[in-house]
Each structure stands twice: as structure tokens, then as C-alpha cells.
């Protein structure tokens, strides 16, 4: 009987801890869909819809150390597909080949794919090296960039709850529609992404 009582107390203690975790990280523990790896935001704050109208400006660098500014990056493309990923996220790595194929398709229309590996923020040398190794193995040629984690773009990145997450940005730096949460490899996700791309290209003609 004592063993049963002790077991019941331990179960209650575990349930209490789980409740606290769910309150702190409401998205944690939910079953991911379309190949996404859900993680809590570092600052615990959701991204407000008003903040999604413009992609946060940044002065960053690519993984080879070349300077990249958001103002010129978006302006030179009819559409920019921005993919947030990290090195140990399997769904992120698995879709790299699809993103590379997409980049080649967009190039014909004056567009491009840009990757942002959240581990490489602040120019972390080890993270950059790891990311470059994976990108090379997957045959990725499109630009991957990093910026200061304390910048507006860095805070935006920290506010993401799921990876991979993909945004479509027009040439004026406006975010088009809602982000694609999860890998783009499924037909449903691919169709959603294509509609946003078409809209962004249409915006660039106005």
C-alpha cells in the first residue's frame, strides 16, 4: 500500500511539472505537421501580425563573410524566399535540395532563395562551419546569411516557434501572406508557397 501511495505521489509531481511546462511553452509537445520541428521562442513572445508587414531590416554577412544588406538584397529580386533553418533540424536539412531546385527556378524569374541558419547568428564560427558542410553535402548554392542576434532581424528569428519556417518577401521588403511552417516538400506546402511567390512577383510589377 505504501508503494502505491508513493507511486501516486510521484505521478502527481510529474503531472505538475508537465503542467508548468505547458504553461511556459504552449506549443511544446504538440504533434508537428508537414515535417516541422517545433521549438519554443527564446523570448517566449509570439510574433505579432503587425510585425509581419515588413521583413526586419538587417546589415549582415553571408557565410563567406561578404556583407549583405536587406535593403539591396530584396530590391534586386522580384521575389525572395527566406528559409529559416538550423543544422540539427532533420526536416530543415531534408528540404535543402528542394530549396536549391526552387532557387534555380526563381533565378529565371529574377528571384532567389536565401537561407538563415539560426545557429549562425552573431557570426558563430563553429556554427557557420557546420552549416557550410551540410550545405555543401546537399549541393546548395543559394546565399545563406547571418546577422546580429540583438538586431530587429535577430529578435524576429528568436521569435520563431517552428523550424523550418519560410517567408516570401517582395522587392519592397514586404512579407507576402502568412509564413509556410514546416517543410515545403509536400504537395500541399509547395502549392501554398507557389501562390505566395506568384503574388510577390505580381507586386513587383506594380
What are these regions (language model features)?
Residues 129-172, 180:
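Short, internal strand/loop/helix patches
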Residues 75-80, 107-114, 138-143, 171-174:
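Loop/turn elements at helix/coil->beta-strand transitions in domains of secreted/extracellular proteins
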Residues 1-59, 74-77, 129-133:
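N-proximal helix/coil linker or "cap" segments that precede and/or mark the start of modular domains
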Residues 87-94, 165:
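C-type cytochrome heme c attachment motif
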Residues 83-89, 118:
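Aromatic-flanked redox-active Cys/Sec active sites in thiol-based oxidoreductases
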Residues 58-80, 105:
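A short beta-strand-turn-helix
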